[in-house]
């Protein structure tokens, strides 16, 4: 989520972003500080986009209260989405989203004059124009100066090398920090609970 404040307007925008294609999959706007619905609606958009997909898709977020909520995580059940969360207070675990929010904001202010908006519908229109520009017209260095949408199309046509990053991975419901603690306790022949009490 990133916030925009100008004139008397305040908006929070949540972007869902594909790290592989660099495409903005969806974005949702809230006109109230702390509105949780934008996160839920955005995730529902992503679920709709993933209908018919069979390969796992990693959804990485920070540990914000919305992302950790039962309501948010219920939407992921029975989907191909695998959850990943940054460590608490570690924005460096999510550098892609942290940096993209910064330079997208800069482009919106400088190139799209978003600060001239005086109503929510104007803001939504400028944001939609930017997302279209970003996905369909803006060359991306990381994609060999291709656009995100064209890169995705080329990938699905088989023009780009396909890598299965999940091939040798075993997914577990148990968080890694719990696995490490359990392994440490077993290696010392002490139960996890006894170890924590010391």
Where are these regions (language model features)?
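Mobile genetic element proteins and their domesticated derivatives, centered on retroelements
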Residues: 16, 22, 43, 59-62, ...
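Active-site beta-loop-alpha junctions of metal-dependent nucleic acid enzymes
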Residues: 9, 28-52
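Alpha-helical structural signal in soluble globular domains
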Residues: 46-49, 71, 75-79
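An active-site-proximal beta-strand-loop segment
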Residues: 1-25, 33
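C-terminal domain-tail junction helix/linker
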Residues: 77, 81, 105-198
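Short small-residue beta-strand/loop micro-motif enriched in glycine and branched aliphatics
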Residues: 23-27, 83-86, 110-112
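Short, surface-exposed connector motifs at secondary-structure boundaries
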Residues: 23-25, 53-58
């Amino acid at each position: 989520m990133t916030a925009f404040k100008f004139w008397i307007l305040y908006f929070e925008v949540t972007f869902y972003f594909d790290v592989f294609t660099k495409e903005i999959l969806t974005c949702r706007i809230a006109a109230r500080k702390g509105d949780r619905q934008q996160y839920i609606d955005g995730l529902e958009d992503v679920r709709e986009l993933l209908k018919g997909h069979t390969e796992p898709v990693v959804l990485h977020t920070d540990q914000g209260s919305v992302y950790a909520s039962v309501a948010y995580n219920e939407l992921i059940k029975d989907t191909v989405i695998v959850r990943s969360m940054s460590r608490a207070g570690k924005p460096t675990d999510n550098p892609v989203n942290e940096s993209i929010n910064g330079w997208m904001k800069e482009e919106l202010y400088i190139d799209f004059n978003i600060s001239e908006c005086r109503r929510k519908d104007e803001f939504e229109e400028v944001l939609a124009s930017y997302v279209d520009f970003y996905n369909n017209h803006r060359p991306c260095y990381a994609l060999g100066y291709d656009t995100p949408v064209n890169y995705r199309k080329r990938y699905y046509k088989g023009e780009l090398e396909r890598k299965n990053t999940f091939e040798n991975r075993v997914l577990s419901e148990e968080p890694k920090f719990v696995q490490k603690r359990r392994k440490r306790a077993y290696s010392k022949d002490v139960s996890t609970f006894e170890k924590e009490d010391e």
